[in-house]
Amino acid sequence: MRVALFGGSFDQPHHGHLAIATAAANALRLDSVLFAPAGRQPLKLDGTVTSFEDRLAMVELACLEDSRFAASEIDAPRADGLPNYTVDTLSELERRMPQAKRFNLVGADSFLSLPKWREPARLLELAEWIVVSRP
């Protein structure tokens, strides 16, 4: 199975997100694209105003557009209130889907900030990266 994690605030999900996911799924023969609203992003601690539950519900509706798309709670807010780190999310995806070929789908602007992320070298080991221009 070939699965891509597509994380983001998704406040609100829009056609651009769906177009990016569709293009990646088609180009890379992905079986699944998991849309994962971020719990608490360490590099964007002030930006999200819509609750995680509402953003997840919006993503669930958006994912109805393509059978390869699914909403995922894998990056839900942590019980301890600490920020969510992509390295932890990708590690959890590896734990849940050890046999899958894993990808991480991000915008080019996010990828450029990768050196600021927690454990950037480990991130590159946990998944292949799909880097896209934003529409």
Regions found by a protein language model. Give the residues of each.
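Nucleotidyltransferase catalytic core that binds NTPs
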Residues: 1-135
